[in-house]
């Protein structure tokens, strides 16, 4: 199928979908969740094919972890869909309004964006997350997964389309591009007549490719060079446990801790404790402030600008909070940054000075997630400032229109 035909079909479906009530959209969502559970064996078998292909291609363990589905992860995806169904539908909400001096009644109402193009790599969960959020908000979506997710996505898209048909919604509101040829992607990125937003989810290369080649607005984000600053007054035992969570809970995610900044005043005391705790967890420290032994490697300045996505952690000793903020400005990706401290005034200073989508005081960066933020599933984590920032839930997939009413009112 030609890409322009695909986009035209999506545009028509988006107009139809926008007219449906919340109850019908929720019925489709609940059917999707049910089918994910009932067809789990089929989905996991398809995923096993993708995993085998990835291993044969020599794809990294971090990417394979993102690609992997198991019973637990699949159940989590189904639960996320049910949670989306429970959320209030933002479409039709009146943001604000009133009656003007002219007598004109005016309201600002939320409406769907229209057609969303999502481009992603080894993340089969994105197929369902994005489809469910777009469905809830009345948007059509074109899904372009990577070649790594070919078999898994084929089954997942089939599940979604069947659920749409069962609920009486337009099947073509969710479509997939299965051919990985980048020429086709380039065609899609030029179809601004039909597609309203592009959301890439993948590495820095994918984001740059979309920014450089798209005539459609692109949401940039998902690159998480996340920092944590251990200020001298922090509770060191609690700090070690928090670092363990932020680094090791799921290292391949974009909200994982990548660089730890330690205030110089406590470095001699704290760093040996850190080294012991991280060694026990299999984490390799990259630092010039500890003697090189097993599990400790020299610091590579270039790697401080990149995600590790693995059990590796940069450790840098910093003079004070001001220097920590300067470091984050230089090396951070405006995703998630944290301070651990007992000094509330310094914490507020950190929040005021750090430019990021999410800033934490005494909490793990792992919370930067649509589900954890109470948004349901997320389509992406935006690190830009327009049109959305941070985890993108339902409201981020809407825009608004001004609805104006008068009694044959004319402007004087």
UniProtKB/Swiss-Prot annotation:
Please state what the protein is called. Gamma-glutamyl phosphate reductase
Any Gene Ontology biological process: L-proline biosynthetic process
Pfam families reported for this sequence: Aldedh (PF00171)
**Associated pathway:** Amino-acid biosynthesis; L-proline biosynthesis; L-glutamate 5-semialdehyde from L-glutamate: step 2/2
| An annotated Gene Ontology molecular function | NADP binding
Enzyme Commission number(s): 1.2.1.41
- Keyword field: Amino-acid biosynthesis, Cytoplasm, NADP, Oxidoreductase, Proline biosynthesis
CDD domains under this entry? ALDH_F18-19_ProA-GPR
Any single GO CC term annotated in Swiss-Prot or TrEMBL for this entry: cytoplasm
Gene encoding the protein: proA
